[in-house]
A protein has these predicted regions:
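A short acidic, Gly/Pro-enriched loop at the edge of an enzyme's catalytic core
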Residues: 100-110
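A short glycine-rich, Lys/Arg-flanked "PGG" loop and its adjoining helix->strand segment in the class I
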Residues: 126-138
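A short SAM/SAH-binding and catalytic strip from SAM-dependent methyltransferases
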Residues: 109-123
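Conserved class I S-adenosyl-L-methionine
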Residues: 1-40, 42-49, 54, 58, 141-170
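Short alpha-helix
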Residues: 182-199
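Class I SAM-dependent methyltransferase SAM/SAH-binding core
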Residues: 54-98
Length: 199
């Protein structure tokens, strides 16, 4: 089992978005998705890295046609158990790096709200974005989430007192950028890195 499968097999992804701070994330994200949907009904939506289906299921219940792609079998199992009786959602096992099962410009909206957390080099990050762009209609919307370095530094290292642990494990650069590998699970980025990937 790889690091990601092992992590999510033992992590309560359902509980994360149900927590107080998780609700802020969920409601804020849904507000922007609804802004993109506008007055029109029945959008075709792809969620890449759908987790246990919190966004995908809610959007399907609102009448949209949803394809939900999830990498980890544990989360996919949970999502599949929750969609019984919902006919306008289709789940898939797969990776954000390969969306070849989907045609070009197939979706009005593509959500990439988790995969970038687990991409550890620029080549993979660019590939995820290229695939999302390819499957999204020219006038469509793509939503992408990242783990931001500075927020993590403030919350995890300073507030939680973990800075010396990171220093001792050589997980910080001289300018306090978190160094991540696959075993660390999450890749922290700065705005300038996102800008460089998007260039």
């Amino acid at each position: 089992m790889n690091y990601l499968e092992n992590y999510y097999a033992n992590y309560d992804e359902e509980g994360r978005l149900a927590s107080n701070h998780g609700q802020v994330e969920y409601l804020t994200t849904m507000k922007y998705i609804h802004d993109a949907i506008g007055d029109s009904r029945k959008k075709k939506i792809l969620e890449v890295g759908a987790g246990t289906g919190r966004y995908s299921i809610a959007l399907a219940k609102q009448g949209h046609q949803v394809d939900a792609l999830e990498y980890t079998f544990h989360n996919l199992e949970i999502m599949n158990s929750k969609i019984v009786g919902i006919s306008n959602i289709t789940t898939h096992h797969g990776t954000a790096l390969d969306l070849s099962r989907f045609e070009d410009e197939a979706f009005d909206i593509t959500l990439v709200l988790g995969p970038m957390y687990h991409m550890y080099n620029d080549e993979d990050k660019k590939k995820v974005l290229e695939e999302a762009i390819r499957v999204t209609k020219k006038e469509g919307y793509i939503f992408v989430a990242y783990c931001m370095n500075e927020a993590t530094m403030i919350q995890f290292t300073f507030k939680a007192g973990k800075i010396w642990e990171l220093v001792e494990n050589h997980m910080l650069t001289d300018d306090f950028h978190c160094i991540s590998e696959e075993k660390d699970l999450f890749e922290m980025v700065r705005l300038e890195e996102i800008d460089a990937i998007n260039a």
